[in-house]
Amino acid sequence: MNTFLIDYQQIQSPAKGFSKLFVDYASEGEARQELTSNFFHYDYRHEADYYKLLGSLSSKSFAREALRDLLLRQNREYGVAEEHLQLLEKIRSPRCMTIVTGQQPGLFTGPLYTIYKALSAVVIAERQKAMFPDYDFLPIFWIESDDHDFEESACTSLFRGSTRQEIILEPWNRLPGQMVSRSPIGPSIRQCLDTLVESLHESDYREDIITKLNEFYREETTLDGGFARTMAWLFRDYPLFFLSPGDPAFKKLSVEVFFRELSTCPEASHTVIAQSSRLEEKGYSAQAKPRTVNLFYINDHNQRQKIEQVDRDFFALSPGKQRYSRHQILEMCGDHPERFSPNVILRAIVQDHVLPVFAYIGGPGEISYLAQYRRTYEHFGLKMPFIIPRGSFTLIEPVVSRIMDKVMQKSGRPSLSRKHMYQTAFHDMAALQKNAIKGGDNHDYDALFDRTAEALARELLALRPALVQLDPTLEQSLMGTSKQAEKALDTLRQKTQRANRRKHDELLGQIDKSAMHLFPGGVPQERVVNIFYYLNKYGPGLIDELAMVLRAHSTESHIALEL
């Protein structure tokens, strides 16, 4: 497998690239230094920070016995191998830290970046163990089971021939705002599985994939349950553990954060707003929008209701008419912490309060909004862990590699490399198409017409002195003739471009096909395509290959990987 590192600054996909904040965070130079020192507590590039964080986490108290019991119970249910489950005993020791990543549950695991997050957590845990052999680092995948965005969780897509096949799970007996973890998938999962089966070509691996997904996704299964079991199966050879924070046992461990939020709101939101203003002053965009109360209340129908602060000491649930005093809602939280759920602002705070988190592995969007939380962490008496970018890949199939070779040949520039072609494709696919047309017959028609237009304008202008001397009224005719000539030449240019495009339609069609594979729907492949398209073609060993590539490279560059 050939790998090519692409700088995030070079990636400008048709619909959406990467945020300025993330690009700066993954780069070198003063902008990054200013960003990390002002908006994060630790910098994973600074060796001294590792010892500070190890000392801080080792001396801090966590409910480690309860964590061991919770993780053991959940991961045994998800099907994690017993040999890996034994490693969970290590979390009882103050010298054991966690490397955390996470995502809301996705249908059949959702987009590729979910897999890349999990692999990144495993590989970075390995690196930390190699650096600090006296400590242990457990990779944990946080499954956002409290999430209520069913539409985002219930869809995925695969390539099917020359098109992209979307698979969408229809909601079944769902109420608005209902958490994805609290309701069965329902009968439409059958149609989803059938569509998946039809989309997978015959291969040596197809039958095993179909069998397992039929086992993990049944009508009575929840989305997070199917997701966890599928991920545990895919990563069965790795000591990766899963955590569902919707578990009542986990909510008990989170209650201190809930209490502080309800007791001091809206102070936490003010910290986010203040930090967001500083970000915007530096030219960055604020991603996360805080609420007055950054908690939801879970009602009897498993719907997440917003908690609104009506005035200083009274709260209301929305939608609904229930009103509670601050004392009442604190009492409710103490008696039933499982009824409360953090929003995007408090999720990271809860995570780092309950778990001894050494590093969080985040995607571009997550890193952007985590930059808003430094003061919020301090409000809850915490410091942020290392925030490390996840691995980022574009998987390039042989057919796309061959198309790139054709473009290189057509360009008339034998010195070009595949890396250059990929860099051009990731930066500006239209430029790649234009270069292919230009190089196809060694004629740069744009330059040819530009030279002709300049020469024609020059020659017509040379007529002016003689014509004006003969008859001043001829100057107006000359100007009209110049405009007509310019218009006629432009019309001829457009006809030439269309003729040239027709001549190269086959190659341009192939470039369009490669664009569909690299940027389906105009966004990076990793945000759209499902892993099972590739596992069906290239086998389960692909997971190991991706892990090997991650071990060999930093996660601060995008990796174009030829399969």
UniProtKB/Swiss-Prot annotation:
Give the matching InterPro entries: Bacillithiol_biosynth_BshC, CC_BshC, Rossmann-like_BshC
NCBIfam families reported for this sequence: thiol_BshC
Does the keyword Ligase belong to this entry? yes
Q: Where does the source fall among the domains of life? A: Bacteria
Using the UniProt record, name the top-level EC class of this enzyme in a single word: ligase
Sections of the chain in a coiled coil: 474-506
What keyword terms does UniProt attach to this protein?
Coiled coil, Ligase
Pfam families per UniProt: CC_BshC, Rossmann-like_BshC
A GO MF annotation of the entry reads: ligase activity
Which family does the record claim for this protein? Belongs to the BshC family.
Its Enzyme Commission number(s) read: 6.-.-.-
Spell out the protein name for this chain.
Answer: Putative cysteine ligase BshC
